C-alpha cells in the first residue's frame, strides 16, 4: 500500500525492507545459491555466507553479493532506470547490452548504478546514501536533490506518477525532510518554493504504463 514499509526475514536470516507497492519472491529454504526476485524497491542486509552467493533478480538485471547492505529500486516502469545503491561491502551488477553481450560491474560503497532499460547501459556515480534509504524510516529526505530524484522518491512512497510538462523545472534542487506527511502537504512545499502547479488525474482518464495516479506538473 502507498506509504507502507514492511520487513521480511529470509530463510538465511537476511533482512529485507520493502517500500510501498514492492514485491519479493523467495523459496521457503535456500538449497544452493540464494536467489530472490524483486519488483519495486527494497533494502537488503545480507547475511554473509562464504559458500553461497546471494542474487537479486529484477526484470532488467541482477545484483550478486556475498554479504553486504544495498538498496535496489526496480519498479515495473519501462520509462525509469533501475538503480542499485551500495551502502557497505561490495556487489557485482550483471546485465546484458542491446547486442546480448553480458557485462559485470563491481560497485564500491557509496556508489549508485543506474541501468537504462532502453539503452541497456549503466551509469555509475556517487549517491547521497542517507537520502536514498530514508524511505525505510517512512521519511523522504532531500539534500540539494534534483527534481527528477525528488519526484522518484515521492512516486515510490505514494504510488503516483509525475509527468513534468515544463522542462525548465528540472533546473531546481530541493532540500527538506518529510516524515508522516500527506502527499498534498509535500506538493504544497513544491508549490510555495518553486511556484509549481499540479494537476492530479485518475489513471483511467489517460494511458498510464504503471496504473498509478498521474500528477501533471507545470
Region annotations inferred by a language model:
Residues 1-218:
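A residue-level detector for the "anchor" residue at the start of short, highly conserved motifs
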Amino acid at each position: 500500500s502507498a506509504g507502507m514499509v514492511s520487513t521480511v526475514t529470509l530463510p538465511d536470516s537476511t533482512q529485507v525492507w520493502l517500500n510501498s507497492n514492492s514485491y519479493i519472491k523467495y523459496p521457503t529454504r535456500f538449497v544452493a545459491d540464494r536467489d530472490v526476485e524483486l519488483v519495486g524497491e527494497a533494502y537488503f542486509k545480507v547475511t554473509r555466507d562464504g559458500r553461497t552467493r546471494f542474487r537479486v533478480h529484477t526484470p532488467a538485471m541482477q545484483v550478486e553479493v556475498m554479504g553486504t547492505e544495498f538498496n535496489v529500486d526496480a519498479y515495473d516502469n519501462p520509462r525509469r532506470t533501475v538503480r542499485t545503491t551500495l551502502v557497505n561491502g561490495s556487489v557485482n551488477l550483471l546485465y546484458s547490452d542491446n547486442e546480448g553481450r553480458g557485462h559485470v560491474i563491481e560497485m564500491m560503497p557509496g556508489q549508485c548504478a543506474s541501468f537504462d532499460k532502453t539503452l541497456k547501459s549503466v551509469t555509475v556515480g556517487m549517491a547521497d546514501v542517507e537520502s536514498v534509504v530514508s524511505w525505510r524510516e517512512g521519511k523522504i529526505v532531500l539534500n540539494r536533490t534534483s527534481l527528477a530524484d525528488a519526484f522518484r522518491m515521492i512516486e515510490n512512497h505514494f504510488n503516483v506518477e509525475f509527468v513534468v510538462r515544463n522542462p525548465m523545472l528540472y533546473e531546481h534542487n530541493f532540500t527538506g525532510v518529510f516524515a508522516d506527511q500527506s502527499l498534498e502537504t509535500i506538493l504544497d512545499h513544491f508549490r510555495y518554493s518553486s511556484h509549481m502547479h499540479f494537476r492530479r488525474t485518475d489513471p483511467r482518464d489517460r494511458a498510464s504504463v504503471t496504473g498509478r495516479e498521474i500528477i501533471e506538473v507545470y
